[in-house]
Amino acid sequence: GQTYAVYSAPDSRSIRGAKGRARVSTNGWIQVFGAEGDWLLVQYAITPEHCRIGYIDKNALPQDAAAPALALEAVPAIVSYDVSVTDDPLMSQTPLTRLTENTSVTALASMGDWTYIEAGTGKSRFRGFVPTECLLGTVTDTREANRAILGSWKLYAGSSVDAEQMTFLADGSMTGCAV
């Protein structure tokens, strides 16, 4: 099998995990999420307790295999407190790098309680996961605000509407219910 360098962003100058030495072997299990330009976003196991999500050269795919294009958003956000960024949100949460309070980032996607972000430029460019709660979204109009809060939200304290869960609908209305 082959081994491929793994980068945190689709850019060979971006930060790499494992102190700059992150690699994946085609002998092991590799989950492919999708393609972005000449890159594949993949996840692979390092140990049973540690995985990594990152980018490899799309030539790693067998010629008869196809990967869908990644559908990532690009929403400006600001980090509201110092936080670690990880390339393994589901298992070890090993830090890839750190962000300080008030750092501007671009939110690309979300997965459970984690948001996939991009920050930095050139050799300090990276993508990784931060807890969604650390981000302050930048909202410029009401329609954007309504889109940003679509879905159901669990309320843990301080609900003045006597509901444990709020659901925000696309038309801007909301409903609340006791769960």
Regions found by a protein language model. Name each.
Residues 1-38, 78-112, 116, 155, ...:
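Beta-loop motif signature
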Residues 10, 34-36, 44-46, 60-62, ...:
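A mature extracytoplasmic/lumenal domain signature
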Residues 22, 52-54, 95-97, 126-128, ...:
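Short beta-strand segments
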Residues 29-31, 43-74, 118-152:
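Boundary regions of SH3-family modules and the immediately adjacent low-complexity/disordered segments
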Residues 71-73, 79, 168:
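A short, polar/charged loop/turn motif at coil->beta-strand junctions and beta-hairpin connectors
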Residues 115, 147-154, 171-175:
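Short, hydrophobic/aromatic-rich segments at coil-to-beta transitions
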Residues 158-179:
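N-terminal glycine/threonine-rich, aromatic-flanked beta-hairpin/loop signature
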